[in-house]
Amino acid sequence: MDVVFKALADESRRKLLDQLHKSNGQTLGELCEHLDMTRQAVTKHLLLLEAANLVVVVWRGREKLHYLNPVPLQEIYERWIGKYERHRLQALSDLKKGLEENKNQKG
């Protein structure tokens, strides 16, 4: 999971992921058109994203297509975000219930 966090720590790599989210299955050239980076920089960032399993490559003939792989992001969500979110939602639910009970007792 550390490799995923390291990959996500860079703004340029997050921009690449955002671009793939907008239009999945892009070639290197297509990605370069939408980003203010050299072809070499995009290639470097894509390799790091592939190593983190955030991007997968599919060859279509001579074209190398890059696809966003959401699985590592989902794993982060489940491990780090989801578990804290559940507690907050439960606390809000308990607060709402308590306020409603208090209102009913007074009214």
Where are the model-predicted features located?
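Amphipathic alpha-helical dimerization/coiled-coil segments
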Residues: 22, 74-107
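N-terminal helix-turn-helix DNA-binding core of bacterial DNA-binding proteins
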Residues: 2-38, 63-79
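Active-site phosphate/pyrophosphate-handling residues
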Residues: 3, 15, 46-47, 93
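A cross-family signal for key residues in well-ordered alpha-helices
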Residues: 18, 50, 56, 96
